[in-house]
Amino acid sequence: DVYKRQAAGAALAAKLKGSDAVAVAFFGDGGSNEGAVFEAMNLAAVWNLPCLFVAENNGYAEATAANWSVACDHIADRAAGFGMPGVTVDGFDFFAVHEAAGAAIERARAGEGPSLIEVKLTRYYGHFEGDAQTYRDPDEVKHYRETRDCLKQFRERTCHAGLLSASDLDAIDAEVEARIEDAVQRAKNDPKPEPDDLLRDVYVSYP
């Protein structure tokens, strides 16, 4: 919960320094109901801070459906109560998210304050290890996988628009997979932490 407030703090620091940095806080539909979000949004709005709040609404907070915990049609509707713009976008559409985020960042850098973006999407897997998602209709996930795969849609649209070729995208995929594999191998080869490391940096220490 703290990082939502930290985003407002980072935005305040950027404003005081005269930086063009914009702080971004990500949280889910469940997290959007927490007081920390309201506190951060209110402070960012009152102090006109360059902060972007992104609500990733995948329809479930652990096993609780969003319509059981959110009374309004869209989480973005709450932005009006804080005096900031709010917009709901299709989270499966890379270009829609890019456009909305770009507009919000441009607005923040122009000194016009924070924004709230609600990104509507789904999650393919459970909330935690061993979550069988018995609270969902299995066909729901199947439907999204077959019809709303954002990576597949991005590939099709960029190729159709001539922005990138299939070979360009294949090369990007290969590069990313190689970087991931390299990171995994480096992590496996690193020495294991010492028992004393468990308590390192937990408490403040003075010279």
Locations of regions flagged by a protein language model:
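Glycine-rich ThDP/TPP pyrophosphate-binding loop and its adjacent helix/strand module
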Residues: 1-189
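Short, amphipathic C-terminal "tail helix"
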Residues: 178-207
